[in-house]
Every structure is written in structure tokens, then in C-alpha cells.
Amino acid sequence: MKTASISFREVKGFGFRFDAPVHLSEGVSAKRLMQSCPYELLTIGDVSERVWHAGRWRRVYVNNPNNGITLLGSSAILKSDLSKEKIISVKYTEEKEDKALKKGWTLISCSGTIGNCAFANAQHAEKLASQHVIRVSPNNILREGVVYAFLVSKYGYSMLTQGTFGSVIQHIEPENVKSIPIPHFPDSFQKEVDDLMQEASSLREEAIDELNEAGKVLKNAAKLRALTPEDYDYYGLNNSGRKVSCFIRKRKDIDTTTINAFNHSERIRN
């Protein structure tokens, strides 16, 4: 059973609501704890140059990486391998500079599974992110690693994902992120946290590079060529960039379980 003591001021601030789920929710409890912090309280808006998402825009998808730029969705920001993400046309994408990501930013998923945070590294840099990713570009008040570490902590996550009255919200807006309180930690503590975050980010980049190099070594040793979209069976709608796969099967090879082409593909059978 969870219990807590609250003041009349808190009850008044919540419209005189006495129901326990409001006052005992993790988000409200985190904000209450922030009030007892020995350091000055700022907000994410105070310690950021900008907090925003790119909004919606028209996208033209392409297959050739030379003609496009990688677009990341809310789930992709957590992936280590971004080579298989969708590519959109450079020519037909306006205001690319405003949509491009920079190293050191905190990226937040604001739709779907909300509140997931990523510390942008070299893999994210200069790629684009959709309207489902909020960017936090820190200023010089707090170090960038500290801002990320706080937002990804249980306190930051609770305040990101819960509304004013403790309910779980379905979508995060930049204004929600800006209003989150964050302590103005001492410089020595900031340096310690930021150094650890920067080291972790560098190690992640090195690990990704090592994995990519290992993949190349394996392909060369096994004499495997790089796969293209044509190497995968495609049975979707007509697409100028993809050839529809086709093959012949004898009637006796098709049972009553399914006549879906994908299930009878030669690649699946092998």
C-alpha cells in the first residue's frame, strides 16, 4: 500500500481533489520531491535553446541513398543500426536544417511509446527525425549530458509521461517538456555526469563501428555481396522502385492452410 502526507496547499492546487491516485502517482510524487531539492529549480525550457518537433511535411521516399537522407521515427532513435531506416528525397524536403539532428541533443519519443529518450550521437547527426520526435537543444546553463541523464531517469520519465493529475498521457507536446522542473546541479556534479554520458556515447559509437566492420569482414570471408531490395520477395502494391516477385507452384504443393504467396516463396522454403 502506498501512502504519503500532503499539504492543504497541494490539495488546493489540484482543485481540492482528495483521491489517492492523483497525489500518489509517480509523476506528481516526482514533482513533490523536486520541491524539497536543495538546489535551485529551473525548467527544461530554462536550460534549453529550443524544445520542438519538426511538424508534418510532405515526404517523397527514395531507394537510392545518394539521392536521399535518412528519416528516423520515434522507435528508431533507440536503435544502434540506422542503416535500414527509410530514406526521403533531399530535393523535395524543405527546411532540412530545421529537421536535422545534432550530436548532444536529447531526443524524446512523443507518440506511440512516449517518453523514451536518446542521447544523440554521431549516428543520429545530420539525419532527419519525424514529428514524433521532440528535440531538446541545451544551452550553457546545464551540460547536455546532465539534461539527458535527468530526463531518462525515473524522475524525468515519470514527469514526461504523466499529466497534471497523474494520468498517463497519450502524446507529449514540446510545452509539456519545457515545463518539467530540473535542479541546477553544482558544476562539479554536472561535469562528473556529463563526462560519463559523453564516454558512454563515444563507446556506443565505437561499438557500432566495430559491428559494421565485423559485418564487412564476414561478407568478404563468405564472399557475400550486399543485398538490394530486389533480393527480397515483394508482393505489395505496384511500386516503380520494386519489382513484384513471381514464381510457379504445382497445385499439389498448395495446401488448404494458405495460398498467400509469401508463404510459398522459394526463399522461405529454403
Residue ranges and their predicted role:
Residues 77, 94-95, 107-117, 148-162:
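Well-ordered mid-protein domain cores that form the structural environment of catalytic cofactors
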